[in-house]
């Protein structure tokens, strides 16, 4: 089963993936962007705000996604795969940027993934207040520097992207305690 943990920055994706790894010790744990060597370099370029063009950023993420699907996801489809972000994030960010048509976004992502999508998305949702608090407690990267309003638009776009891609979506209140969130995810994984 291929699942992805989605959510805006600080929602707790990494924490939940670490908890899930305790329950699925043989799972393939990966992330997008950055799940391959090429992806790590692409992630570094984007997070350090080295790319100014939103179209160039979109194309870099597509390149990472294609490589990630070919090198990590496709060879392991018979195993449990848990990904920190997925095609859903790529579509959501592109929708919010608004520089590329929805049709083109979906077509290019379908091309990059070969139609291989997670079977289920777990979206960790934050309130405006909780997001403000969490962001105030860390050094912000290039994407987080775009602001709270931008990140909340991304959160809404993650829901839209899941629907556009016809991927089953489980919404989770990320303000709950860590163990409650983990249990909710486990209850919704059908193996």
Curated annotation (Swiss-Prot):
Against Pfam families, the record matches this protein to: Thymidylate_kin
Family per record: Belongs to the thymidylate kinase family.
Q: Transferase as a keyword?
A: yes
Q: What is this protein called?
A: Thymidylate kinase
Q: What does this protein do?
A: Phosphorylation of dTMP to form dTDP in both de novo and salvage pathways of dTTP synthesis.
Checking SUPFAM superfamilies in the record gives: P-loop containing nucleoside triphosphate hydrolases
Q: Where are the transmembrane segments?
A: none
Query: PANTHER family, per this entry?
Result: THYMIDYLATE KINASE, UMP-CMP KINASE 2, MITOCHONDRIAL
Output the Gene Ontology terms for molecular function.
Answer: ATP binding; dTMP kinase activity
Q: What GO biological process, any one, is recorded here?
A: dUDP biosynthetic process
GO CC annotation terms, alphabetical: cytosol
Q: Which residues form a coiled coil?
A: none
What does the entry list as the binding residues for ATP? Answer: 7-14
The species this protein was found in: Sulfurimonas denitrificans (strain ATCC 33889 / DSM 1251)
Keywords linked to the UniProt accession = ATP-binding, Kinase, Nucleotide biosynthesis, Nucleotide-binding, Transferase
> What's the Enzyme Commission number for this chain?
2.7.4.9
Q: Which reaction does it catalyse?
A: dTMP + ATP = dTDP + ADP
For the keyword ATP-binding, the answer is yes
């Amino acid at each position: 089963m291929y699942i992805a943990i989605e959510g805006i920055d600080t929602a707790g994706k990494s924490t939940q993936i670490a908890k899930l790894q305790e329950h699925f010790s043989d799972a393939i744990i990966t992330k997008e962007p950055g799940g391959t060597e090429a992806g790590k370099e692409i992630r570094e370029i984007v997070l350090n705000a080295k790319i100014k063009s939103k179209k160039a950023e979109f194309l870099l993420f597509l390149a990472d996604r294609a490589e990630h699907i070919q090198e990590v996801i496709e060879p392991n489809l018979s195993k449990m795969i848990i990904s920190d972000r997925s095609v859903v994030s790529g579509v959501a960010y592109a929708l919010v940027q608004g520089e590329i048509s929805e049709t083109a976004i979906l077509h290019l992502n379908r091309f990059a993934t070969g139609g291989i999508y997670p079977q289920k998305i777990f979206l960790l949702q934050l309130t405006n207040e909780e997001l403000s608090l969490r962001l105030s407690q860390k050094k912000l990267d290039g994407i987080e520097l775009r602001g709270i309003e931008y990140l909340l638009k991304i959160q809404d776009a993650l829901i839209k992207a899941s629907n556009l891609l016809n991927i089953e979506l489980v919404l989770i209140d990320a303000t709950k305690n860590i163990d409650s969130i983990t249990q909710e995810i486990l209850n919704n994984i059908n193996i």
